[in-house]
């Protein structure tokens, strides 16, 4: 089985990548992180595909609050959609594609069109459910 992964940041997806690599099942992992930040991830460099052009400036910008909510939200949207489009354009042949829900709509469609199974990974529960749980706990 060949598995391709997509994550605009790092999160738990790199743990999954290491487990898949240990079983010779990792085809590729796409990330918005710059390559120099990934040297100690324990993965073969040829399996890591980076697209840091929007995410790195976003992460490094020290005063996002001065931009206003609309600008930050637009930047986050562009970060996810440009990354997703990049992954869709560079999708390798694979049996399974796992992408985080915020940035894998186009790439998930591309993977399915190529015959792969698509797993839309939601790293946490829905925000409405989180709010409900917190309200119950603090009532």
Regions found by a protein language model. Give the residues of each.
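N-terminal subdomain of nucleotide-sugar transferases
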Residues: 1-51, 88-92
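Short N-terminal targeting/anchoring amphipathic segment
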Residues: 4-7, 87-104, 110-121
């Amino acid at each position: 089985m060949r598995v391709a992964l997509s994550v605009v940041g790092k999160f738990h997806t790199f743990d999954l990548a290491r487990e898949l690599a240990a079983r010779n099942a990792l085809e590729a992992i796409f990330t918005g992180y710059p390559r120099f930040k990934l040297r100690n991830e324990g993965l073969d460099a040829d399996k890591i595909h980076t697209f840091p052009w929007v995410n790195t400036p976003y992460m490094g910008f020290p005063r996002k609050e001065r931009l206003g909510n609309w600008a930050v939200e637009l930047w986050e949207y562009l970060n996810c959609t440009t990354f997703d489009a990049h992954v869709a354009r560079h999708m390798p042949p694979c049996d399974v594609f796992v992408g985080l829900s915020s940035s894998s709509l186009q790439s998930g469609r591309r993977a399915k069109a190529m015959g792969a199974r698509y797993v839309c990974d939601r790293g946490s529960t829905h925000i409405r459910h989180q709010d409900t749980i917190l309200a119950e706990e603090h009532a």
